[in-house]
Amino acid sequence: MKQLLDFLPLIIFFAVYKFFDIYVASGALIAATALQLVISYMLYKKLEKMHLITFVMVTVFGSLTLILHDDSFIKWKVTIVYALFAIALGVSQIMNKPLLKSMLGKELIVEDKVWARVTWYWVSFFVVCGLVNIYVAFSLSQETWVNFKVFGLTALTLINTVLTVLYLFKNMSEEDRKELK
């Protein structure tokens, strides 16, 4: 249920874009992200920081897109969110308080050097995705960008997540692996 809730705004954005245009889809994205927060709070009695940050970014860049009737803003949002994620992960690692370890370290017990590699891997991933987003958003058609944003970046993120879990699992002790099964 939680994963479906995470994809709700993206699904609504894509569906509305296909029937209308980028501006109606941007408005729908703002509404869907707000709805995501409400449902998340109702179900889990808390709001995740990532959802709050995403809501603020979607609201700011979606509103600018609507008010100025310029799709550049909603396109830049993707890159800026990825940049913020990369910065947050990188800074947390430099300060020896890795975010990924704090989020997953209780379930996935591996050495700190493994968490460091995973963190820098994700920093690199977010930087590359942000740069590729800029290229696709401003060099190719709007429809290509929407498809890339919805399917390409989502697929890349899912693949990256699976690779990360496999890498972490590979670096766990045999005993810790058995506890997860």
From Swiss-Prot:
Localization, UniProt: Cell inner membrane
InterPro entries, alphabetized: YciB (IPR006008)
Principal cellular location given in the protein's record: membrane
Statement: the UniProt record of this protein carries the keyword Transmembrane: yes
Residue ranges of the TM segments: 10-30, 50-70, 72-92, 118-138, 148-168
Membrane topology listed for this record: Multi-pass membrane protein
GO cellular component, one term: plasma membrane
Pfam families in the cross-refs: IspA (PF04279)
Keywords: Cell inner membrane, Cell membrane, Membrane, Transmembrane, Transmembrane helix
Keyword Membrane found: yes
Family listed: Belongs to the YciB family.
PANTHER family, alphabetized: INNER MEMBRANE-SPANNING PROTEIN YCIB, INTRACELLULAR SEPTATION PROTEIN A-RELATED
Role according to the record: Plays a role in cell envelope biogenesis, maintenance of cell envelope integrity and membrane homeostasis.
NCBIfam families: ispZ, PRK00259.1-2, PRK00259.1-3
The protein's name in its UniProt record: Inner membrane-spanning protein YciB
